[in-house]
């Protein structure tokens, strides 16, 4: 209970303080600064003077002040509303700037995306290079086979040439042998009777035909 009573006292004190402040504000509202002449002299002083107008005028003034305050608040509210509008404009500008900032980012992304296919295109090129290398390696291997085949062909051609040369050598040797045989036979025929010469010539012709 003590806590509640303390709270009630503080509330009542606060209310009293608020009332005093409001009364002081009302008194101040009843005062205003004016140029006032001092006594019978011509001196004029600008100081706070209580309002000397009747209460009706005070009420009207208070109403006018309230209206002015409302108008001022309304004027301030458009300013506030305009300030949010300006904030919106700033937001739009910031959005535009962010979009402008994002557009270079997009351009960078597009530029990054465009180099990205280049590695991909480079990969096929690497593949083609690998294929070319493989083809070259195969070509290197195949040329070995081709060299072997060329060697075989050359060997076969050499063999053919050797065989042909041997045949050629054999033919002249055969011809020379035949010539020697014919010469020997002719020499033999010189000391042989004509009947035997005919037989030998016939045998030579048969051997030549064979």
From Swiss-Prot:
Task: Please tell me which positions the record assigns to the cross-link Glycyl lysine isopeptide (Lys-Gly) (interchain with G-Cter in SUMO2).
Answer: 199
Residue positions, PTM Phosphoserine: 203, 207
Q: Where is the composition biased (Low complexity)?
A: 108-125, 151-165
Q: Where is the composition biased (Polar residues)?
A: 74-84
Composition-biased stretches (Basic and acidic residues):
54-72, 128-145
Query: Which terms in the GO cellular component ontology are assigned?
Result: chromatin; GBAF complex; nucleoplasm; SWI/SNF complex
Question: A biological process (GO) annotation for this entry?
Answer: positive regulation of stem cell population maintenance
Presence of the UniProt keyword Plastid in the record? no
Residue numbers spanned by region Disordered: 48-210
By sequence similarity, the record places it as follows:
Belongs to the BCL7 family.
The linked condition is: Chromosomal aberrations involving BCL7A may be a cause of B-cell non-Hodgkin lymphoma. Three-way translocation t(8;14;12)(q24.1;q32.3;q24.1) with MYC and with immunoglobulin gene regions.
What is the name attached to this protein's record? B-cell CLL/lymphoma 7 protein family member A
Please report the organism this UniProt entry assigns to the protein: Homo sapiens
The organism's lineage is:
Eukaryota, Metazoa, Chordata, Craniata, Vertebrata
């Amino acid at each position: 209970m003590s806590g509640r009573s303390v709270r009630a006292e503080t509330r009542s004190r606060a209310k009293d303080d608020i009332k005093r402040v409001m009364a002081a504000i009302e008194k101040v509202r009843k005062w205003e600064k004016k140029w006032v002449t001092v006594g019978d002299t011509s001196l004029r002083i600008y100081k706070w003077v209580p309002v000397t107008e009747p209460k009706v005028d005070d009420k009207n003034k208070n109403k006018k002040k309230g209206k002015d305050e409302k108008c001022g608040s309304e004027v301030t509210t458009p300013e506030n509303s305009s300030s949010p509008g300006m904030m919106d404009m700033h937001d739009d500008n910031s959005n535009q700037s962010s979009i402008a900032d994002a557009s270079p980012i997009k351009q960078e992304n597009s530029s990054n995306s465009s180099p990205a296919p280049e590695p991909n295109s480079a990969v096929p090129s690497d593949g083609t290079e690998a294929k070319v290398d493989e083809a070259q390696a195969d070509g290197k291997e195949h040329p070995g086979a081709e060299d072997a085949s060329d060697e075989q062909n050359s060997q076969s051609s050499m063999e053919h040439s050797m065989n042909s040369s041997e045949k050629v050598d054999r033919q002249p040797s055969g011809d020379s042998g035949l010539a020697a045989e014919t010469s020997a036979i002719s020499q033999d025929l010189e000391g042989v009777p004509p009947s035997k010469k005919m037989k030998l010539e016939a045998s030579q012709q048969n051997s030549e035909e064979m």
